[in-house]
Amino acid sequence: KLAAMIRCDTTSYANVYDPERFERFHAQLEQLFPLVHEKLERTVIDGNLLFCWKGKAHDRPIVLMSHQDVVPAEGTWSHAPFSGDIADGKVWGRGASDTKASLMAFFQAVEELLAAGYEPANDVYLSSSCTEEWAGDGAPKLVAELKRRGVRPFLVCDEGGGIITEPIGGIPGNFAMVGVFEKGKADVKFTARSNGGHASAPMANSPIARLSAFVTDVEKHDPFRRKFLPEVSAMFARLAPYAPFGLRLVMGNLWLFQPLMKLVLPRVSAQAGAMLHTTIAFTMQKGSDACNVIP
């Protein structure tokens, strides 16, 4: 089923809505999960999906979220990005992990529970945005619909961790990483200006030089303080028994080794280090439209 979902190209682009692309995907979902579509109340809002599974009570509803769109498939692939190939014990393709796998998982879970005649104790909502990859208005529209219905979720499960190998350098094995908190996000645009000019007579300290110096300085001197939140400390405590002796000693005694971990962890694992502080990543840049013009 996951392979079939991957074969439906649901690439999304900022501020561009292709209804036919997502209508094809919705038709595929209906074929794959007929009971979900027969028994649950379905609402479609500009390609965004909301299913309501009525439970015995309505005071503590849960929301299961997973977006249906994927980012453009660029670069080279060992398997075609929308092939849905099953090889080497894996399903390959764009969206296999981000995040049609979780979308498939909760649809399949509900499908099997419906087949078994199960009735949930409380209402369950299945929510899927088609604009997540570019921070579009899909999720806000679904939230607005829940508010309109007077739904106040007791629990929301969104895209988070997965079953990963070696979550931190030196700890082998497969671990199910359940996310219990989420970072915020801000996009900041930095602009350097000048009077412009021609590359044959460049001025000193050009906009590109200034921005390059700024980027280099920020990456060398991280302005954000590192700290261990309680949830992060608890994760290390849970992982400690599976670590080699030296690492187990450190992770099991964070009250003593926190200063050392703050220094070393980002060098050992970028992903683990990101749990300790606000991160900065420079991702897009634009200058002159011609190679011989100074912006």
Residue ranges and their predicted role:
Residues 1-99, 113-122:
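Acidic/His- and Gly-rich active-site-bordering loop/insert found
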Residues 146-149, 154, 162-174, 178-187, ...:
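Acidic-enriched catalytic cores of C-N bond-cleaving enzymes acting on peptides and small amides
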Residues 3, 30, 104-107, 111, ...:
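Predominant activation on well-ordered alpha-helical scaffold segments within soluble catalytic domains
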Residues 1, 290-295:
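Short, intrinsically disordered, charge-balanced linker/junction segments flanking boundaries
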Residues 7, 11, 34, 115-118, ...:
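Generic secondary-structure signature for well-ordered alpha-helical cores
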Residues 91, 97-177:
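Acidic/histidine-rich catalytic neighborhood of metal-dependent amide-processing enzymes
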Residues 97, 194-200, 289:
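A generic structural motif
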